Amino acid sequence: MRHFIIVKLKDSSKRRELIAPITELFSASYEIDGVSQVSVHECCTPFENRYDIMIEMVMEERALPVYNDSEMHRTWKRVYGELIEKKAIFGAET
């Protein structure tokens, strides 16, 4: 499955500086059995009404609850949650 986390930051001007630390944090998800790919994308359009960052994960369906309960996921919420205005979570079959 593909798991997408699409984020609109409270301050979009910070998105570029957040890409590297978010990528580093999410690289820990490779330690979860069944996660095969993780990529972090920065929005490339300058419009204010766009989301800023998209995190894409490819995983086996059984890995999703493990990811949700992981320390990495808790760190994501704790460290970056206050910077997020809104987010969309989307799952798709591969």
Q: Where are these predicted regions, by residue range?
A:
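Non-catalytic alpha-helical scaffold/packing segments enriched in small hydrophobic residues
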Residues: 4, 21-24
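Compositionally biased, intrinsically disordered low-complexity regions
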Residues: 7, 12-15, 29, 38
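Residues that form or flank phosphate/diphosphate-binding pockets in enzymes
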Residues: 13-17, 49, 75
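Short, conserved charged micro-motifs
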Residues: 13-19, 63-67
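A generic local structural motif
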Residues: 23-26, 41-43
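An amphipathic, aromatic/His-enriched active-site/gating alpha helix that lines ligand/cofactor pockets
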Residues: 24, 30-34, 58-90
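Glycine-rich beta-strand-turn "strand-cap" elements at beta-sheet edges
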Residues: 39-51, 77-94
